């Protein structure tokens, strides 16, 4: 499993990560080149295949500058939110980057708005109201909506719809791939009979 391999590789870097304060996990859906980063940063490949990869970007500083990764055709990038350099953050970072990759969005630079984006992604199949999410984060509904729109450039409802549509598309594409593989295996089995 790719996720297990990524986490295993990252776990082996625990001593090396002690020299860095912050990190972001990037996933790409294609064979990708490592972009240039600032001298106080490092780009660590965790998993690299023809069909994609996972990279950990770490910084000795308390912040990491945002990289605008190209999103062209089937060549997509997903990045987690910025985390403090702790290996135990990696499972959540992997989940965050996966949502960003397949739902086609970037997390807000605002820590609180990014946290809300992740919450909405994790709970995309649930029914919830703006009021209930606002209350969960101790905001009034109007303030919550304003804060979210300012942090993401879209309304909460638009963001949830965007995530659900892209996730649905991902599920359909994966189902089609599995069906094609299954048909090929069945055709081979029938031919063998």
Q: Across the structure, where does each feature detected by a protein language model lie?
A:
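Short coil turns linking two alpha-helices in DNA-binding domains
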Residues: 140-141, 189-190
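Helix-turn-helix DNA-binding elements, focusing on the entry/boundary residues of the two helices
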Residues: 130, 141, 145, 179
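Short glycine-rich hinge loops at helix-strand junctions in the catalytic core
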Residues: 42, 125, 176
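Residues at or immediately flanking beta-strands
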Residues: 74-78, 127-129, 178
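Short, Lys/Arg-enriched, Trp-marked, Pro/Gly-tolerant hinge/linker segments that flank
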Residues: 87-91, 98-118, 122, 131, ...
């Amino acid at each position: 499993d790719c996720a297990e391999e990524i986490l295993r590789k990252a776990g082996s870097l625990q001593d090396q990560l002690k020299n860095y304060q912050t990190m972001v996990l990037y996933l790409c859906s294609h064979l990708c080149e490592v972009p240039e980063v600032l001298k106080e940063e490092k780009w660590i490949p965790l998993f690299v295949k023809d069909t994609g990869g996972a990279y950990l970007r770490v910084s000795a500083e308390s912040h990491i500058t945002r990289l605008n990764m190209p999103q062209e055709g089937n060549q997509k990038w997903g990045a987690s939110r910025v985390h403090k350099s702790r290996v135990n953050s990696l499972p959540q970072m992997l989940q965050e980057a996966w949502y960003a990759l397949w739902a086609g969005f970037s997390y807000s630079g605002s820590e609180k708005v990014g946290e809300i984006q992740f919450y909405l992604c994790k709970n995309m199949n649930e029914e919830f109201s703006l009021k209930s999410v606002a209350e969960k984060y101790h905001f009034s509904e109007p303030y919550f909506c304003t804060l979210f729109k300012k942090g993401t450039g879209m309304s909460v409802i638009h963001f949830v719809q965007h995530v659900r549509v892209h996730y649905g598309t991902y599920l359909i594409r994966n189902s089609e791939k599995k069906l094609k593989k299954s048909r090929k295996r069945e055709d081979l089995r029938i031919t063998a009979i």
